[in-house]
């Protein structure tokens, strides 16, 4: 299963925000410069993260973005569920001759459940914990 670039950038953004001191604001330009992402794309990502309650946005000259809840409460699995279309096949959308005897759908459902269960064990905080190399890469100049 491949995550969309939207989810990839959302996870990177959450990791970066979690690396900052508690309640410290950053801005979209800083995030786009760090990850080399277009501003337009990142605005959409951050808006969606805000709608979902992951990111708090502050408007105005001294505004910015920060995590809305502790990184220890944000699981990678939760973010993926919120952002990804998780249907691996389009069973039921179109007629398929083998549907009555097909076992693939159940196998794919089990694989998806195992994938998400693994990601549910991982919080944004755990990705930073004891990871000094990552913290150095994320540090502001």
From Swiss-Prot:
Q: How is the cofactor bound?
A: Binds 1 [2Fe-2S] cluster per subunit.
Gene3D superfamilies listed in its UniProt record:
Winged helix-like DNA-binding domain superfamily/Winged helix DNA-binding domain
Quote a single Gene Ontology cellular component term: cytosol
What's one GO MF term for it? iron ion binding
- DNA-binding annotation, residue ranges on this chain: 28-51
Q: Where along this sequence does the record place binding of [2Fe-2S] cluster? A: 91, 96, 102
Asked whether the UniProt record includes Membrane among its keywords, one would answer no
Per its UniProt record, what SUPFAM superfamilies does this chain match? Winged helix' DNA-binding domain
Instruction: For this entry, list what GO says about its biological process.
Output: negative regulation of DNA-templated transcription
**Which keywords does UniProt give here?**
2Fe-2S, DNA-binding, Iron, Iron-sulfur, Metal-binding, Repressor, Transcription, Transcription regulation
PROSITE patterns per record: HTH_RRF2_1 (PS01332), HTH_RRF2_2 (PS51197)
For activity, the cofactor(s) needed are: [2Fe-2S] cluster
Where in the numbering of this chain does the HTH rrf2-type domain appear?
A: 2-129
Q: From which domain of life does this come?
A: Bacteria
Extract the signal peptide range: none
Q: What's this protein's function?
A: Nitric oxide-sensitive repressor of genes involved in protecting the cell against nitrosative stress. May require iron for activity.
- Record's protein name: HTH-type transcriptional repressor NsrR
Q: Which organism is it from?
A: Vibrio parahaemolyticus serotype O3:K6 (strain RIMD 2210633)
Q: Lineage, please?
A: Bacteria, Pseudomonadati, Pseudomonadota, Gammaproteobacteria, Vibrionales
Name of the gene encoding the protein in the UniProt record: nsrR
């Amino acid at each position: 299963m491949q995550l969309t670039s939207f989810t990839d950038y959302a996870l990177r953004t959450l990791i970066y925000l979690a690396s900052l001191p508690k309640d410290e604001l950053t801005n979209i330009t800083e995030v786009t410069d760090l990850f080399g992402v277009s501003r337009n794309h990142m605005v959409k990502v951050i808006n969606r993260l805000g709608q979902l309650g992951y990111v708090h946005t502050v408007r105005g000259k001294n505004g910015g973005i920060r995590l809305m809840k502790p990184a220890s409460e944000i699981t990678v699995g939760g973010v993926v569920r919120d952002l990804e279309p998780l249907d691996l096949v389009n069973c039921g959308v179109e007629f398929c001759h083998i549907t009555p005897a097909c076992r693939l759908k159940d196998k794919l459902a089990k694989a998806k459940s195992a994938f998400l269960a693994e990601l549910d064990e991982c919080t944004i905080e755990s990705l930073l914990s004891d990871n000094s190399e990552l913290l150095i890469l994320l540090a502001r100049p």
